[in-house]
Amino acid sequence: MLAEGEPAIVQIGWAATCVMFSFSLSLVVWGRSGL
């Protein structure tokens, strides 16, 4: 999926997606822990 010479905006987009996914999982875990 990652090609050479890929635009920076695409890499930033993937990074943002990964961050938001991890953040969502953290909220779910913390929510179930009662914090």
Swiss-Prot record:
Which residues constitute the signal peptide according to the record?
none
GO BP terms: cytochrome complex assembly; photosynthesis
Q: What is this protein called?
A: Cytochrome b6-f complex subunit 8, chloroplastic
Q: Which organism is it from?
A: Chlamydomonas reinhardtii
Whom does it interact with, and what assembly results? The 4 large subunits of the cytochrome b6-f complex are cytochrome b6, subunit IV (17 kDa polypeptide, PetD), cytochrome f and the Rieske protein, while the 4 small subunits are PetG, PetL, PetM and PetN. The complex functions as a dimer.
Q: What else is known?
A: Unlike its orthologs this protein is not encoded in the chloroplast.
Q: What is its main location?
A: plastid
Instruction: Tell me the keywords, alphabetical order.
Output: Chloroplast, Electron transport, Membrane, Photosynthesis, Plastid, Thylakoid, Transmembrane, Transmembrane helix, Transport
What are this entry's molecular-function GO terms?
A: electron transporter, transferring electrons within cytochrome b6/f complex of photosystem II activity
Query: What's this chain's function?
Result: Component of the cytochrome b6-f complex, which mediates electron transfer between photosystem II (PSII) and photosystem I (PSI), cyclic electron flow around PSI, and state transitions.
Which cysteines pair up through disulfides? They are: none
Q: Where in the cell is it found?
A: Plastid, Chloroplast thylakoid membrane
Keyword Thylakoid found:
yes
Question: Which family is this protein grouped under?
Answer: Belongs to the PetN family.
What does the entry list under GO cellular component?
chloroplast thylakoid membrane; cytochrome b6f complex
Membrane topology listed for this record = Single-pass membrane protein
**Superkingdom of this entry's organism?**
Eukaryota
Coiled coil, from the record:
none
Q: Where are the transmembrane segments?
A: 10-32
